[in-house]
Amino acid sequence: MNPYEQRRRRVLDQLQFGEMMVLYSGESVASSMDEGFEFEANHHFFYLTGLRRENMALVLANTHHPAHVILFIEEPIPDMERWTGRRVTIDEAKAVSGIDDVRYIDSVESLISRCVARETVEAAYFDCYRNAMGDTDSYNMQKAKRFAQQYPTIALKNAHTMLSAMRMVKDEDEIKTLERAIAITDQGLRRVLATLEPGRMEYQQQAEFEYEIRMRGAERVSFPTIAG
């Protein structure tokens, strides 16, 4: 059993019969007519699926025996992929997430509607995290509000509380990932020290660090580097 499946089982163990959880990875935000800001997937979605692409959704529904575990992804469009890059295929999504039931994202709303209509749904969990009162609603918050309007008799619960508590205690896979990240960071800092000399600029040392960690397999830095 892969770590994402183990985490989903822990979530399902906490859902009462008649409860469901819906998580969205989010959507990219356009920065211009032909470009978008760098996409950051919802962390809870990634925690339960291992996937970081936009326009995906996960439905966990303890409304049936056995419980529903369904992943929704974007349908590949070859002409678009020339400009946006390859999309995850159904087989790839199954392999990464360990979820057997993978469908295309345009069917997620109808699935939720059928689940509500045909099964006993008393409460629905969405990621309703808000850092401050003035914050713009996240994509998941927007979906939660829309769900509440469409199904006012179903209680809305915050998945953020449950999932944040789970993520505070690292499992074996997370510990191994952290140890690898620490080792890569160490090598990056050693390169910074080895190349440091009078006259070098901060942005040059930033480039040395990021080159080293990327050459060792890091996808990116965890936080933006503060360098002048």
Give the label of every model feature segment.
Residues F17-M33, E179, A183-G228:
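Active-site cores enriched in adjacent His and Asp/Glu residues with nearby glycine-rich loops
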